[in-house]
Structures are given as structure tokens and as C-alpha cells.
Amino acid sequence: MRRKRDSYDYVIIGGGSAGSVLGARLSEDKDKNVLVLEAGRSDYFWDLFIQMPAALMFPSGNRFYDWEYQTDEEPHMGRRVDHARGKVLGGSSSINGMIYQRGNPMDYEGWAEPEGMDTWDFAHCLPYFKKLETTYGAAPYDKVRGHDGPIKLKRGPATNPLFKSFFNAGVEAGYHKTADVNGYRQEGFGPFDSQVHHGRRMSASRAYLRPALRRRNLDVETRAFVTKLIFDENNSKKVTGVTFKKNGKEHTVHANEVILSGGAFNTPQLLQLSGIGDSEFLKSKGIEPRMHLPGVGENFEDHLEVYIQHKCKQPVSLQPSLDVKRMPFIGLQWIFARKGAAASNHFEGGGFVRSNDDVDYPNLMFHFLPIAVRYDGQKAPVAHGYQVHVGPMYSNSRGSLKIKSKDPFEKPSIVFNYLSTKEDEREWIEAIRVARNILKQKAMDPFNGGEISPGPQVQTDEEILDWVRKDGETALHPSCSAKMGPASDPMAVVDPLTMKVHGMENLRVVDASAMPRTTNGNIHAPVLMLAEKAADIIRGRKPLEPQYVDYYKHGIDDEKAGAMEDDPFYQY
């Protein structure tokens, strides 16, 4: 894969989630030449660490797959936090947990509140979610889900008995079951959708970019690290191309339009390196400002999470699959049949709840796993175990990203300010207490062998917060660092109607950095939707018609609307 030209209609910087969508959609116009520049390597079909769903723990922290970012010392945690970012075609969709969650419809109603953002409400976003999905767990007549999109979604199956007990425990704790957290009712417990198809990871590159590579007007160049934007000599606001390095050599490519899709870390970094950002800050780094946009690198959001781990009394967990002696058999089973323990990401179910009555929609997310293991592969010292991942979904803590120098290869300074507000601390205390209350219900009694982490010694509010500060990890959802918003918003970077950078010509941003607020779930699906919608904007196509559908609203709809625990045909 390499470029065939020196000039293109569109140059897309980043072959990750958004870049893969854009490369495929923009090249549908046969009269337009498209180049995708990816700094990482190719996502080879034979690479087990990418393609095998259960191998998801191996790429993180591995320099061949992961850019290995770290925050600065977080001021309210007293330590640095590792951030894995995909160093491969497909970006982080090639190394993530493969969980597909749209977020709550109310997230997008919040996006649409500012002036000029009305076309980003749920009704306008829904048709693009449906366009990208093939939802095998949804009925053919389901008007909320998509049925013929490039992203193939597996529902559950969550057949391990621990899942059913966990869902029932949620009901015993006063919550409800839901058939589809991406459907009418997000609130409640039930099976999750995952981007796993025929036992393989369904990354954005596999779903979008690979099938489009047969087109003559689409080129993809890997190991191409973009170092700077090129500007018109007579117009400092007009972008005309990019410079990138590959194998130690510098290359230049010209473009009618440049689209930044490097993600929430790389996009603001490249903007600042190019003189777009806070003018005084840029001057302090020896960079001549081109456009004063103080929101570049600000408004930074992420989700923090912890694992609550339990010993399992019955031999039903997947803990034995972590035994190195069993791994060869599990691997061979996957290689030859795409079946067995390696054919699932094992994040097959969980739930969303409100931790208090002050919030209108779920502010806590739970991922349940029938195994006790950390994301880095460190397993709990038990024969059998299970765990729940939990964390607040719309924290009001905000961080920032700032370049350290003019060197494009030097990683930027990153601070998320986790746990920096009283509201954030309160929600964390609620999150742990809600999770523990669910895990101690009768439905879990046959399996509950006692809490391993944090352990019974952690009880008071301060003890809980100390544990979160010590043990909390990123859920890997960085976003909003170059947010969409009207020009009247001094912190907005991207025009929501055009995806162009305010005040600049031929420069757009399409990735997680453009999100105005993070959503209450994993952010991969919202990024795909954003890119699908942006592709129509960039191509000048008529947008898909908005679709106004019902969805569950707490305090307005009946409390049990869409709930499934009383349905005798609901298998969970």
C-alpha cells in the first residue's frame, strides 16, 4: 500500500476509526482522488494479536501496536496514567475492547443545545448510526437499529451462567433488564453488542478501508508520520498539503483539502505545531500563530474506570483459559475454526444505571467479565473469578493537551484532571457503592466467594477515593480536544456545519477530538457515526433525513417501559 500521486483531492491524516470511514466514503466519488496517511503499520490479516478477539490484552503496552502515551502526573491522583493508542491501520479500533455502544440519545440532545449545533441531535445522528451497522441481535423490523451497514455486530451471547446471575442481581438491586442498550432503552442490564464477526475483530479498517482498496482512486500509505501542514505562500490560512516522514525520508504531498483524523491526541498536537491554537502559548514554544483558537487541546475528556473483582465459588469462570498450558489449544481452535474462548472479547454484557435521582439518564456504566484479569493481562490469584468494570460516564473534570516543543515526534503534555471536582468524587463514591450493592445480591450467592479487589478493608468514602486514585485506569475514551461548536463559542475549534477549522481554508477535523461532549459509553461507535455524517458534509451530499423515534426517558415514561425482566421469552 503506497501512494501513486503527488497531489490528491483529499489527504486524510490518520487511518484509524474516522480515517477508515472517510477513506471509504470519499473514494466512492470516482472523480476524486483520496490518500490516507497512517503513521502506524498495516493491520495484517495473519496478526493474531489484532485479529483474535480474546488477544485484546496483548497489544496495549506493546510498542509494535501501541503509541504508549502517558499523562503527566495527574494532580488529583499523584501518578501518571498510561494511555494505549493504536499504532496500526485501523487505529485504536484494531486494539480496543470491541465494545459497540452508541451512548444515550440524550447525549446527542446535549450536543445540539448550543446555537448552530441543531443538526447533531439524536434524530439527525440516528440515520448515520443505522447506516454503519449490521445488527445481528436486532429484529428485522427494528427501526432503531441498522441492518445492512459495514460494521457487523454480534449480540452477547452472554451464555456463561455468571452473566445471567449478574443481570438478575441488577434487578434485585432495584434496576431493570434491557434487551438492547443501543436500542429503545439504554438504562438497565443486558447483553452487549461487540464488533466481532465470524470470530474475528471487526475493526474500522477491516469494515471500511480494506473493501475500498480495490478502487483506483484510493491510496493508503502506512508508516507515514505527518510532521507539518503546508500553507499557501500568499495566504497563511490556506492549507495546500502535508509533509510526512517515512523510513527516515521526508515526503511532500499536495491536496485540495486536508482532513485531520489522527484522534484526540494527534489532531490538537498537529494543529498547535501548525500555529493553530492559543496564540500566547504558541509563541512561548517558538511557533508563529496563524489562527488564535484557544480551544485547541482544551476541553479534554476521558472516562476513568476500576475493576471490582470477586472470587468465584463454582468452576464456571474463564479463569482457567489464562493458564499458559491451555493457550496453545485455545489458539489452534481459533486459527482453524474461529471458535472457542479466543473468538470472543468476553465483554458480552453489562449495564447502565443512574447512581442518584438528580441525573436524567444513566451516569454509570458496567462491563461484566466472567474472569478476573486486568487489561494488561495481570490475573487475580484465584482458580475462578469474575469482575465488573465501573466508572462515571459524564464527569465534569476537564483536562488539556499541550505540545512541549516544535518537535512533532515529541509526545505532548497531557493532563485529564481526573477526580478534580467534588461532583466527580461524589459520583465515584456512588459508583463503587452501587456496584458492590449489585454484586452482593442473592442472585450472585451461588458464585460469590468474596471480594478480591478493592477488598473488605476499603469502606469509607475516603478509603474508596484513595483506592480509585491508586487503582483507576483510563477506559481509553479520550475526546473533545478540538470540539465542534459555533464561531461565537471562543473554545470551539470546528464548524459543526462544515467540519472545517474555524478561520482556516481547506482544513477539516473529523475524529473524536471534534466531539463537543463525550458520550456515556465506549466512544468508538459515536466516532464512526460522526465520520459517516461528516463524509456526506464533505462530499456536499444531501444529509440523510432525520429520524424521530421514541426512546426511554426517565421521569417521563413508565419506569418499566422497555424493561425485559417480566418477559417470559427473554432469555436473560
Curated annotation (Swiss-Prot):
* Annotated pathway: Amine and polyamine biosynthesis; betaine biosynthesis via choline pathway; betaine aldehyde from choline (cytochrome c reductase route): step 1/1
Catalytic activity reads: choline + A = betaine aldehyde + AH2; betaine aldehyde + NAD(+) + H2O = glycine betaine + NADH + 2 H(+)
Q: Which cofactor does it need?
A: FAD
Give the matching Pfam families: GMC_oxred_C (PF05199), GMC_oxred_N (PF00732)
- Molecular function terms from GO: betaine-aldehyde dehydrogenase (NAD+) activity; choline dehydrogenase activity; flavin adenine dinucleotide binding
Enzyme Commission number(s) of this protein: 1.1.99.1, 1.2.1.8
Biological process terms from the Gene Ontology for this record are: glycine betaine biosynthetic process from choline
Q: Name one GO cellular component term.
A: membrane
What keywords were assigned to this record? FAD, Flavoprotein, NAD, Oxidoreductase
Against PROSITE patterns, the record matches this protein to: GMC_OXRED_1, GMC_OXRED_2
Q: Read off the HAMAP family from this record.
A: Choline_dehydrogen (MF_00750)
What the entry lists under PANTHER family is as follows:
CHOLINE DEHYDROGENASE, MITOCHONDRIAL (PTHR11552:SF147), GLUCOSE-METHANOL-CHOLINE GMC OXIDOREDUCTASE (PTHR11552)
The free-text function statement in the UniProt record for this protein reads: Involved in the biosynthesis of the osmoprotectant glycine betaine. Catalyzes the oxidation of choline to betaine aldehyde and betaine aldehyde to glycine betaine at the same rate.
Q: What is this protein called?
A: Oxygen-dependent choline dehydrogenase
* The gene coding this protein: betA
